[in-house]
Amino acid sequence: MKPRTLLQGLAGLAAWGCLSGLALVRLWAVLYGRVPGPAILAAAAALAALVVGAAWRLRLVPRLLLPFGPTWRTALLAGAAFFLGALLDTSYGLFSAGDMAIGRLPFRLVCALGSGLVLAGVVLALATAARRFGRLELPRGRALLLLALAVNVLTALYAAGSATVYYWDSNIYWSSSTMLAGQSLDLAQVRLVLQSVITQEYNYLLSWPISLVMRVLGTGRYVYLFAIANLYVLPALAGMAALARRVRRGGVLLACATPMLLYTGLTGFVDVAAAGVGIWAFVIYTDQERPQSARGILTGALLTLVFLLRRYFFFFTVSFGLASLAALAVRRSQWKSFAAMAASGVVCSLFFGQSFLVEQVLRSNYFDTYSAYDQGRWVDAVMLCRYFGWVLMAAALVCVVWCLLRRPAARYTALLTLAQPVLCLLLFTRVQSHGQQHLLLYLPALCAALSLIHI
């Protein structure tokens, strides 16, 4: 046997062992009490073998996991991701191990190694996809600088001239940011933030960056609003500029046409960060000049991130996936991008968001939980017109219909842009009515529709 073949076999065996440990703990969190322990162990081993076999059969390592080729830079990136994944593994936060054997050190160690291996694979795949996707040609720096200046001036004027009372979501995130800012900045706090993704509806993913600013500038209202504006609103505006990059001053025009983004941030809703991620998902997935696999992998990760930031954005994720599938009806050649997006989204969702998918999506009855928030469809229509304006929505619809009827090259993007908000509206209104922050679900598609004007 050749040394190279032997090394590959040993590496595959080691990967199988690590993944078996991770799969055992993840399956135990879901199946224990319903399925016997030995059956869970067998299922974990079989699942790990299936993953390793598929990776070998499809040659995923040379195709997707070598962003810099077989070089020291790839090894360094993989090693760093593996170390962080093993060190910060939160799999045991999914259940209480108690005195069970699965809670002992050998199982914890193998699970941590499996978590490190998966995170290394995710990071390498995203790095490879990003390099193949290439750089986006954003507008000149002066336009972005103008947007940043305008946002900060408006934030200062609003903060000085208003006395907003923050309650519910906005107060929760301000309070959690203040709480994190008062704690020691160490590994324990990082673990606390990651554990919150598993255990809390309002996790600390968006509070933690704000808390870093508060450590330096204080925990007052001005600091909170400026942190939201600069950390979360500005990246969303940069996404608008990327969407409308083929139109002269397109980013500025989109920003002016959708003031509800900044206003929602100024009223204390960190949800604008999730809307920004959704905008970037449209930017990447609809750029048909880029490699399909790269677009799909990056978009799948963004669609996972968006609902990790704010749970209700899962409606955006599901509707985007269904709309992407529907859009294949007008351009079947884009199936690779959809397949890559689906695979990336499934892997990232199961690894980072298993608790949410199992406990809140599969086991919860949303119709009963949120029935008190259902105020009828008239309220939804009023909210949409109040925050977007019927003229702007009509203009977006005209752009989409025009491209569907007159611009064959843009039909794929136009159908995606039309189907996503419609599906999202149908899904969301089956559960509850919209609050102010929930309207951010439709902002990415609205911006994408208006940006079709250049085609």
Task: State the predicted function of each range.
Residues M1-A23, R34-Y158, A340:
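Start-transfer (signal-anchor) and selected internal transmembrane alpha helices
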Residues L19, R73-L87, R142-V153, A255-C256, ...:
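Transmembrane alpha-helix segments characteristic
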Residues L50-R63, V118-F133, P235-A241, L325-L328, ...:
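Hydrophobic, aromatic-rich transmembrane alpha-helices
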Residues I172-L180, L194-T219, F226-N230:
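Short hydrophobic/aromatic helix or loop-helix immediately within or flanking a transmembrane segment
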Residues L212, V223-R249, W280:
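Transmembrane-helix motifs of polytopic, lipid-linked glycan transferases
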Residues L262, R295-R311, G321, V422-L425:
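Membrane-interface alpha helices of multi-pass inner-membrane proteins
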Residues Y263-A274, G435-Q436:
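Short acidic/glycine- and proline-prone juxtamembrane loop motifs at membrane-interface regions
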Residues V330-R377, M383-V398, L425, T429-R430:
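Membrane-lumen/periplasm interface segments of specific transmembrane helices
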